Amino acid sequence: MVAEKPKTLTSLEGDDKLNSNFVRDEDERPKVAYNEFSNDIPVISLAGIDGEKRGEICRKIVEACEDWGIFQVVDHGVGDDLIADMTRLAREFFALPAEEKLRFDMSGGKKGGFIVSSHLQGEVVQDWREIVTYFSYPTNSRDYTRWPDKPEGWIKVTEEYSNKLMTLACTLLGVLSEAMGLELEALTKACVDMDQKIVVNYYPKCPQPDLTLGLKRHTDPGTITLLLQDQVGGLQATRDGGKTWITVQPVPGAFVVNLGDHGHFLSNGRFKNADHQAVVNSECSRLSIATFQNPSPDATVYPLAIREGENSIMEEPITFADLYRRKMAKDLEIARHKRLAKEEMPFKELDEAKFESKSIDQILA
């Protein structure tokens, strides 16, 4: 019998055994501890990026994108006080009673708000996390009724944080554009009217962290992601298809930059799309704030620069909406096969499994 899916992870506090909804297959379980840190991911200072150090900084970023698709940046222009406020208010939200958090429940296709694990329907196993999602750009599409009004002041701080992260993202996209031999704003223009989504992840203490994940292995669909994480540790990356993993060393005040699928395709595969996951632990909770910089749904996805002797890695141009739908459909197909294997579902039942048609706004929720 399948256990009922919890509406908050707070309701599971004190359990000494992991709820069966969160138990991963053995091949998906963590292979490296949350605090077994690696220094393989470079930490790059952006100080002087608009001056004489620009060439050196660009070289380091390009090397990281070609090697891992992940790097960390410091001296990025986002103030320490703003980072501290955003982090503090986020933790205060997740400490609220369940009924307060569930006022912003985003299940059922709502655009933004609070949910446990993931917005995707059809997932076999849940991720051990609670999240709050903000759709922050374009600014005229912000729905403040879906932005939590507690703790007091979080909306204002999130607005400022969103604006600063948009500026930082455009700076980094300019570097990558130059590296591809294009004009400074080439990647930003390829996004058309750039979307931004902020996802605040809270990973509570877990009774059996060796059996689950905070966030399953994936690549991000968009252009780049800027991740602010606390000092606990849990972000992991692989560059050999999951054979070996490293845990990214947290750096105070740094942003981890992940290249996404869109950035990978625009570079014709030159820049890797970061293959990563999040693990949890039984000692303490962890907080991270991911800011996803995505192209608009109707933006064309196709390599912007194809080097001599290379062919395009894409057969034809498609829209970002179509790219994302294909990615989601593939993920859900894998999930269905896993469910079939675990529950021995009849093929007829598998064919009739619920798969709702969603708008791109709901898909990117």
UniProtKB/Swiss-Prot annotation:
List of residues binding Fe cation: 218, 220, 276
Cofactor binding note from Swiss-Prot or TrEMBL: Binds 1 Fe(2+) ion per subunit.
Binding sites annotated in the UniProt record for 2-oxoglutarate: 286
Enzyme class: oxidoreductase
Pathway: Secondary metabolite biosynthesis; flavonoid biosynthesis
Keywords tagged on the record: Dioxygenase, Flavonoid biosynthesis, Iron, Metal-binding, Oxidoreductase, Vitamin C
Disulfide cysteine pairs (residue numbers): none
Keyword Nucleotide-binding on entry: no
Descriptive protein name: Naringenin,2-oxoglutarate 3-dioxygenase
Origin species: Dianthus caryophyllus (Carnation)
